[in-house]
Amino acid sequence: MTFTEQLSAAWQRNDSLLCVGLDPDPAKLPLSMTGTGGAIFSFCREIVDATADLVCAFKPQIAYFHSQRAEDQLEQLVEYIHDAHPGVPVILDAKRGDIGSTAEHYAIEAFERYKADAVTVSPYMGFDSMSPYLAYPGKGVIVLCRTSNPGGSDVQFLQVDGKPLYQVVAEAARERWNTNGQMGLVVGATFPNEIAKVRQIVGDMPLLIPGIGAQGGDIEATVKAGRTADGTGMMINSSRAILYASREKDFALAARNVALQTRETINRYRHG
């Protein structure tokens, strides 16, 4: 199945728009795992098993693995998700952006080494920096558009022909870049007005929406701004609020409870 097909099936099967971000910070791991070999994989595996029936996707953030020399554990994790929970897509959050020849190797990293179903990329260097990822049939390419961090406004609100840059990116994705239906866009929950504008521009294109949970994005405003006519169209990401709900032995159950509550809150407004 393609990334888009997997995502659509997961929306329906798990009745969920929730994406759980896998950002394993060694300083916040459960006390019982601190300093143990393979702790990053073990922690993420427990989170995955506790939440897989509640989510539409998992999103490992590559920097949390690379900074700990845990690339092998990231490979192991993606393989585990595919084997133990088939049908739940894995988005590699890498935010890559480089010239085409270098992007070819980043695409190999994402799709051949890590075997992710989708990857996040930056559009700043133009279409030729993204085309190597699109050369992989069925893989998702999720483009930064209006990010959740406050500093995103420094660039994303610069005016281009009377429009903010993030709108120009959304229009380019819709009109020129998404020829094979592989693209999605990143739009932060911290900016619901911009979510609504991007949805208006791109139609039913999937939106990856970080910023609820620890970043404080409003779930009701996010869902109402970003949902498609059938109540889907979004991967609403929560990382820290779920991952670090507890540092005790009950951490996986605590994570499940927060994920369940988050899914239920999303669905309250999704179907309302």
From Swiss-Prot:
EC number: 4.1.1.23
Pathway(s) annotated for this protein in UniProt: Pyrimidine metabolism; UMP biosynthesis via de novo pathway; UMP from orotate: step 2/2
Keywords from the named record: Decarboxylase, Lyase, Pyrimidine biosynthesis
Record's keyword annotation contains Transmembrane helix: no
Catalytic reactions of this protein: orotidine 5'-phosphate + H(+) = UMP + CO2
PANTHER family the record matches: OROTIDINE 5'-PHOSPHATE DECARBOXYLASE (PTHR43375:SF1)
Name used for this protein in its record: Orotidine 5'-phosphate decarboxylase
Organism expressing this protein natively: Cupriavidus metallidurans (strain ATCC 43123 / DSM 2839 / NBRC 102507 / CH34) (Ralstonia metallidurans)
Gene name for this UniProt entry: pyrF
